[in-house]
């Protein structure tokens, strides 16, 4: 099984994923961003769009699926995947690829209102007011309105700690 934690930057995916992993027996965190970082390390760089966002490179989506499948085949259990996917076509490719391998997916979106997200990004000790993180607030809002919230279980983190959000997700997964 895969527990996918979607949402924009500042929603708490990375922190929450580590806490979810502790609450779900036999689970591991798989950061699909590392697959993208590998693609970005190819020299000279890959052609086409993607230099600013590796998700635009067509190999990224099937490589995420294949990596997840191989890890689950090898280790079993559950993968917790903290990864923003705001392009509906990309989510469809990933979810269809996982379905082809009969891998069940619980798709959660960690949501917070725009003011809360901006405050979290401003207060991030690793990179306060990151332009990279801020540029995804509007695309997230658009995806949330048009498709994302309808495709996932929404966890509003506006007034939740990461531990509270993780508990809510783990309880939903465990049934």
Enumerate the predicted regions with their spans:
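The conserved Walker
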Residues: 9
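Walker A (P-loop) ATP-phosphate-binding motif of ABC ATPase nucleotide-binding domains
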Residues: 2
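Walker A/P-loop
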Residues: 14
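Glycine-rich phosphate-binding loop used to anchor ATP phosphates in small-molecule kinases
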Residues: 56-105
């Amino acid at each position: 099984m895969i527990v996918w934690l979607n949402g924009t930057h500042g929603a708490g995916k990375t922190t929450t994923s580590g806490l979810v992993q502790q609450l779900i027996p036999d689970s591991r965190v798989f950061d699909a961003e590392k697959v993208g970082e590998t693609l970005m390390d190819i020299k000279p760089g890959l052609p086409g769009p993607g230099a600013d966002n590796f998700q635009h490179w067509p190999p990224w989506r099937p490589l995420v699926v294949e990596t997840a499948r191989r890890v689950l085949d090898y280790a079993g259990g559950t993968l917790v995947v903290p990864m923003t996917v705001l392009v509906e076509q990309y989510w469809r490719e990933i979810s269809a690829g996982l379905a082809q391998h009969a891998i069940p997916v619980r798709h959660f979106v960690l949501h917070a209102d725009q003011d809360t997200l901006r405050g979290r990004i401003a207060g991030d000790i690793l990179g306060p007011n990151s332009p990279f993180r801020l540029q995804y607030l509007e695309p997230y809002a658009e995806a949330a309105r048009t498709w994302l919230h309808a495709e996932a279980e929404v966890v509003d983190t506006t007034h939740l700690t990461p531990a509270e959000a993780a508990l809510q997700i783990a309880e939903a997964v465990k049934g």
